[in-house]
Amino acid sequence: MKEKIQKNILIKNKRATFDYEILDVYTAGIVLVGTEIKSLRLGKGGLVDTYCYFHRGELWVKNMYIAEYFYGTYNNHVARRDRKLLLNRKELRKLEEASKSMGTTIVPLKLFINERGLAKLQIGLARGKKQYDKRASIKERDDRREMDRALKR
């Protein structure tokens, strides 16, 4: 019997929800080499300044950081290489059409290990926020926090 995975590793892109309005969310598999998955299980990764793009009908994630595995030998991976994402053909076509429209992009939202031990990347079709939208988001968050404080008293 297989041993259960102890904890669900989760790496979030905190800037994505602040900088973008998320229109649609997908969960994609990600092609990794051995030392990359070992490093991710230790929680050594980052999604800062990461984005997705299409190349020859395939979806790739660019600038995703996965730290080199500490116990890796000369076979260790490159920390910021482009990695292929795995989605259904129907989802790929839908995303490609949507990303070609003006003002939309595909951004990674979070990276996690599922119950089967596979690395998954949650991506979102997003539209950039204007500066005043960001200010409104901050004000709304502060107002919600103050209301919660008042209710606790």
Curated annotation (Swiss-Prot):
Coiled-coil parts of chain: none
Q: What is this protein called?
A: SsrA-binding protein
Q: Which InterPro entries match?
A: SmpB, SsrA-bd_prot, SsrA-bd_prot_CS
Give GO BP annotations, semicolon-separated: trans-translation
* UniProt main location, coarse: cytoplasm
A Pfam entry, by short name: SmpB
User: Subcellular localization, per the record?
Assistant: Cytoplasm
Alphabetized GO MF terms: RNA binding
Keyword line: Cytoplasm, RNA-binding
Q: What cellular-component terms does GO give this entry?
A: cytosol
Organism in which the protein naturally occurs? Porphyromonas gingivalis (strain ATCC BAA-308 / W83)
Does this UniProt record's set of keywords contain Cytoplasm?
yes
| Gene3D superfamilies registered for this protein in UniProt | 2.40.280.10
Q: Does the keyword Transmembrane apply?
A: no
Similarity-based family: Belongs to the SmpB family.
What this chain does, per the record? Required for rescue of stalled ribosomes mediated by trans-translation. Binds to transfer-messenger RNA (tmRNA), required for stable association of tmRNA with ribosomes. tmRNA and SmpB together mimic tRNA shape, replacing the anticodon stem-loop with SmpB. tmRNA is encoded by the ssrA gene; the 2 termini fold to resemble tRNA(Ala) and it encodes a 'tag peptide', a short internal open reading frame. During trans-translation Ala-aminoacylated tmRNA acts like a tRNA, entering the A-site of stalled ribosomes, displacing the stalled mRNA.
